[in-house]
Amino acid sequence: FFLLAILPVSTVAQGVDNKPANGAGASRLRLSNSDEIGAEFDSVPCANSDRLNSVKALFERMGAADSEITIEKRKKVENLVIRKTGSQSDSGKIIIGAHFDKTEKGCGAVDNWSGVVTIAHVYRALREYLLNKTVIFVAFGDEEKGLNGSREMSDGIEKNSRQEYCAMINIDSLGMGAVQVADNLSSRKLVDLSKSVAADLKIPFNHSNIAGGDADSTSFLNKGVASVTIHGLTNEWPLILHTQKDTAAKVNATAVYLGYRLVLEMLMRIDSSPCSAFR
C-alpha cells in the first residue's frame, strides 16, 4: 500500500451476523470462519522470492486445481490469475484482486498477505457456487514498485472490451482495525455499496481519504472500470507498514474475517446486478 495519511477508524467488533445477507441460495456457499482465516497467518512467507509459490499453494488448499491457476507474465511482472466462468457469458466480468509482493522489511503480513488470504477464501466460498458473471481472481505482483502488476493487467484490456468489466474489488492491508473503504481510490457507487453491505452485515465500517496514497484499484479506474479499495488500517500504520514490525503478530484475525465477509457479499451483489448499476 502506498500511503501518506489516513483518517481515524472505529473499534473492530468481535462478532458479525453469520448469514450472508443476499438470502436464497446463500447456504450453498462454503463460508470460512475467523479461526480458519487466522490460521493462514501461522506461517506467512517473509521473502518476496517465496510469495508467488505460497499464493499458488494457498489457492490449491482452497480447492483450485493446478490447471485452473495461470501465471500471467507481462514485462517481467507476474500475476497469478484464476478465472471462474459465469453462467451468463454476456453478463460481464468482476475482478477481485490483492497484491502479493511486499517491501524488503518485515513479513508483509498486513501489507498484503491479509489481502491474499481474503481473496483466496472468497474463491473457496464461491468455487462451487453458480455465479452469473465471470469472476477473475488476481494476485498482483510488484504493487510496491508502482502498481506494476495491476497496471499491466489493466493495460491489457482492449478499449472496446472495457464495458465487459463491471467492477474491480481491491483488498489491501486488512487486519489492523475496522474495515474501511478508501474513498479517493474508489468509484462512488462502489463506495456506497460497501457502506450498504457493511450495514446489512452489521460490520463496523468507516471511510478514509488516503492523501497521496495509491492502490491497485487506480490502475483500473484509469481505464474507466468501476473500482474500489477495501482496507483495515489505523492511524498507527506508519509504525507497521513497510517496517520490520509488519508481522503476523500485528494481524487481528477477526478484522480480516470481517473484511472477507464484506468483500464476499459485495461481490455477490455485483454478480446479481446489471453492470450499469455501478458505473
What are these model-predicted stretches?
Residues 11-47, 84-86, 91:
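N-terminal hydrophobic or amphipathic helices/low-complexity stretches enriched
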Residues 32-85:
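A non-catalytic alpha/beta surface segment that caps or lines the substrate-entry region
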Residues 81, 93-97, 136-139, 166-171, ...:
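Structural recognition of the beta-strand scaffold that forms the well-ordered cores
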Residues 42, 60-65, 121-131, 155-162, ...:
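Sec-exported extracytoplasmic/periplasmic mature domains
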Residues 1-8:
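Bacterial N-terminal signal peptides
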Residues 177-279:
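Active-site-adjacent substrate-binding region
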Residues 102-197, 203, 209, 213, ...:
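Acidic/histidine-rich catalytic neighborhood of metal-dependent amide-processing enzymes
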Residues 34, 38, 52, 56, ...:
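Extracytoplasmic/secreted envelope proteins and their assembly/folding machinery
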